[in-house]
């Protein structure tokens, strides 16, 4: 059995047997042609500096490594007086010699050099464009995720601050709640008219306050301060009962959980009436007596495919609606349409 012999090369170590060391290649006696892919020769025709095909090939006299003329001259001018491949000493350009035979070989393999370079430029431009689009889409997705995360943090912070404000400034509500166990009736009598006055001012058509998310906050129902929990709503026009050119605006509302469907219906009627008056230029005033909770009917989507809508009873609270129909941690989506008698 032949024992392996180690042949040392400048860059690689080959394990060759005695047969491989001493054998002679078989000569081709007929006209057989061996096809070799140009890609397999790319490493032999590539400049180690620019990693592109050799142009105006220059060979080092000491170590016989090949480089592009511009690449090796630039490397020597930069101060590294050595071969970029093997680090042999190169004093100056006198250590280099042109290699026209290798240039002729490349021109034989690639007769249309300009066409090859143009094709390569097109491939690189296409890759760059695709990568830029992918980077842009991924950047947009990351930006949307960060915005959603920061928005959720702002919502929690705003709710926490509003709860603290309610607890610190809600002495009137505390007095009104303590009338059952506290014999002091004087504080309850003082808190009662103030609540009635605030309710009357809200029913008189005052502009609702803007919430932190750009929506509107509906008027609190009587006794709204007794329940600290709040529910966020998304009001949309009924897709089947409302014309597209009608009330197509999506409304975002935040109110207490013990508000009823009738409260929302009356608030919606008042809000739409005020908007219509503003569009008409304020020619006709809107009074509280003209607004009724019977003008609009509130629906909720209960079908899995989104095509089935259930009418909500006016006495139901939003908390019961959320527990019975919604049961997911996202704003409650409700739909409204004019009542058939009112329409």
From Swiss-Prot:
GO terms for molecular function: chromatin binding; histone H2AK119 ubiquitin ligase activity; ubiquitin protein ligase activity; zinc ion binding. Its main location: nucleus. The keyword Glycoprotein does not apply. Residues 89-94 are annotated as: Interaction with nucleosomes via an acidic patch on histone H2A and histone H2B. It comes from the Eukaryota. The keyword Transferase applies. E3 ubiquitin-protein ligase that mediates monoubiquitination of 'Lys-119' of histone H2A (H2AK119Ub), thereby playing a central role in histone code and gene regulation. H2AK119Ub gives a specific tag for epigenetic transcriptional repression. Essential component of a Polycomb group (PcG) multiprotein PRC1-like complex, a complex class required to maintain the transcriptionally repressive state of many genes, including Hox genes, throughout development. PcG PRC1 complex acts via chromatin remodeling and modification of histones, rendering chromatin heritably changed in its expressibility. This is E3 ubiquitin-protein ligase RING2-B. It comes from Xenopus laevis (African clawed frog). The gene is rnf2-b.
């Amino acid at each position: 059995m032949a024992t392996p012999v180690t042949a040392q090369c400048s860059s690689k170590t080959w394990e060759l047997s005695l047969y491989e060391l001493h054998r002679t290649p078989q000569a081709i006696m007929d006209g057989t042609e061996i096809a070799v892919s140009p890609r397999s020769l790319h490493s032999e025709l590539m400049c180690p500096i620019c990693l592109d095909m050799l142009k105006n090939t220059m060979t080092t006299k000491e170590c016989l490594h090949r480089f592009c003329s511009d690449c090796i001259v630039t490397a020597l001018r930069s101060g590294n007086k050595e071969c970029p491949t093997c680090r042999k000493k190169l004093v100056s350009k006198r250590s280099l010699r042109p290699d026209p035979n290798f240039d002729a070989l490349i021109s034989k393999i690639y007769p249309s050099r300009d066409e090859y370079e143009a094709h390569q430029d097109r491939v690189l431009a296409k890759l760059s464009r695709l990568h830029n689009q992918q980077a842009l889409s991924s950047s947009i997705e990351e930006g949307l995720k960060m915005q959603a995360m920061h928005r959720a943090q702002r919502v929690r912070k705003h709710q926490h601050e509003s709860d603290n404000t309610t607890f610190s400034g809600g002495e009137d509500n505390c007095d009104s709640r303590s009338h059952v166990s506290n014999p002091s009736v004087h504080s309850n009598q003082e808190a009662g008219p103030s609540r009635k006055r605030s309710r009357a001012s809200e029913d008189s058509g005052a502009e609702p306050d803007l919430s932190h998310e750009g929506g509107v906050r509906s008027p609190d129902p009587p006794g709204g301060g007794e329940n600290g929990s709040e529910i966020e709503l998304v009001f949309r026009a009924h897709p089947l009962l409302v014309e597209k050119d009608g009330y197509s605006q999506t409304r975002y509302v935040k109110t207490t959980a013990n508000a009823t469907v009738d409260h929302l219906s009356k608030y919606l009627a008042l809000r739409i009436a005020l908007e219509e008056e503003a569009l008409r230029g304020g020619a006709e005033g809107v009074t509280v007596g003209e607004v009724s909770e019977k003008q609009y009917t509130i629906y909720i989507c209960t079908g899995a495919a989104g095509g089935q809508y259930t009418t909500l009873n006016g006495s139901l609270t939003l908390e019961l609606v959320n527990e019975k129909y919604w049961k997911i941690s996202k704003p409650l989506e409700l739909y409204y349409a004019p009542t058939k008698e009112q329409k």
